[in-house]
Amino acid sequence: RYPFLLVDKIIDLSESHVVGVKNITFNEGFFQGHFPGNPVFPGVLQIEAMAQTGGILALSTVADPGNWDTYFLKIEEAKFKSKVVPGDTLLIKMELLAPIRRGICQMQGTIYVGNKIVSEAGLTAQIVKRS
């Protein structure tokens, strides 16, 4: 949700994977301080973009996704291979590693700029129905 939405659109969604797109623009507020005169899209926000994209995959498995929340439980093996700058378009791929059981889902995330991997991580989340 705005103002913390880090996925512009979903371009592919199946039972086992999802692909989202995020266009990085200089207008993003965090570029004022990260870093002045040398804008770099923060790695922690790349992980958040993976989490948001993965949340769409996880919630696509329930009948009424608007009544569920996704909570991320674990981030593993996060790697940042190249910096992301204004003008880049991120292709965010999330793959389900095993069937969702008891609301727990394990995913592998990879972010590309063009054909180049810029970051990757394993994420574990839980989907919970709102009471």
Regions found by a protein language model. Give the residues of each.
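Hydrophobic beta-strand-centered segment that forms part of the acyl-chain substrate-binding groove
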Residues: 54-93, 118, 125
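Catalytic strand-loop segment that frames the active site of acyl-thioester-processing enzymes
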Residues: 2-41, 46
